[in-house]
C-alpha cells in the first residue's frame, strides 16, 4: 500500500497536483486542508483548515503545499515552513509525463508537473512549482520557493533567485541572473 499525503491548499493548483499524484501512483491522497474551502476537490475531502495539520500528522506523514504562486511566494513559504516545523516529510512530486535528468537535483516539496523538462546539471530548490511544459535547461539554478510557470524557458546557466515568479511563456536568455522575489511577466524575454 502506498504512503499517504495531505495537500495544503484546495484551489486550481491542488487540482493539477491531484492529477499528477494519481498518475505518479506513489502516494494515496489522504485529503486536503484549506482555510477558505470545504467540501471536496476532485473527489477528495477538504478535512478542515491548516489548524488540523498537527492532528493529521499521526495518520499521514507526507505533505505538499498545493497553493499556487502569483506575484508573491509568502503564503507558500509560510505553509512550507509550518509543515517542516510539524515534522512532515515533504517529498518531491514528479509527473511520469515529465523528464528529469538523473544529473539534475530537486529540493524537498517541489512539484514537477506534466511535460516539464529539467536537464542535466540543473538544480531546483525547495518548495518550487515547475509547471506544465516548463523547461529548465542545463546548469540552470532555480532558488527556493519559485514558480516557473507553464511553457516558460529557463535557458542554460541562468540563476533564478529565491521567491521568483516566472510567467507563462516567458524566456530567460542564457546565463542571466534573476534577482530574488522578481516577478517576470508572461511572454517576456528576460535578457
Language-model features, listed with the residues they occupy:
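Hydrophobic, well-ordered beta-alpha structural blocks that scaffold small-molecule cofactor pockets
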Residues: 1-44, 54-55
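Small/polar loops that bind or transfer phosphate-bearing groups
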Residues: 9, 67, 174
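Alpha-helical elements of the RecA-like P-loop NTPase motor core of helicases
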Residues: 15-19, 74-77, 144
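Glycine-rich, phosphate-binding/catalytic loops in enzymes
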Residues: 24, 80-83, 146
Amino acid at each position: 500500500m502506498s504512503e499517504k499525503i495531505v495537500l495544503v491548499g484546495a484551489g486550481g493548483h491542488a487540482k493539477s497536483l491531484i492529477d499528477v499524484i494519481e498518475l505518479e501512483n506513489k502516494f494515496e491522497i489522504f485529503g486536503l486542508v484549506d482555510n477558505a474551502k470545504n467540501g471536496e476537490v476532485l473527489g477528495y475531502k477538504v478535512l478542515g483548515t491548516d489548524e488540523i495539520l498537527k492532528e493529521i500528522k499521526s495518520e499521514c506523514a507526507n505533505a505538499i503545499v498545493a497553493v499556487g504562486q502569483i506575484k508573491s511566494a509568502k503564503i507558500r513559504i509560510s505553509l512550507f515552513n509550518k509543515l517542516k516545523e510539524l515534522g512532515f516529510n515533504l517529498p518531491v512530486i514528479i509527473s511520469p509525463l515529465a523528464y528529469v535528468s538523473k544529473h539534475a537535483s530537486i529540493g524537498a516539496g517541489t512539484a514537477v508537473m506534466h511535460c516539464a523538462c529539467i536537464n542535466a546539471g540543473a538544480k531546483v530548490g525547495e518548495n518550487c512549482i515547475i509547471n506544465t511544459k516548463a523547461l529548465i535547461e542545463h546548469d540552470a539554478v532555480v532558488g527556493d520557493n519559485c514558480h516557473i510557470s507553464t511553457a516558460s524557458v529557463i535557458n542554460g546557466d541562468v540563476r533564478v533567485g529565491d521567491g521568483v515568479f516566472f510567467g507563462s511563456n516567458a524566456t530567460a536568455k542564457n546565463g542571466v541572473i534573476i534577482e530574488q522575489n522578481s516577478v517576470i511577466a508572461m511572454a517576456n524575454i528576460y535578457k
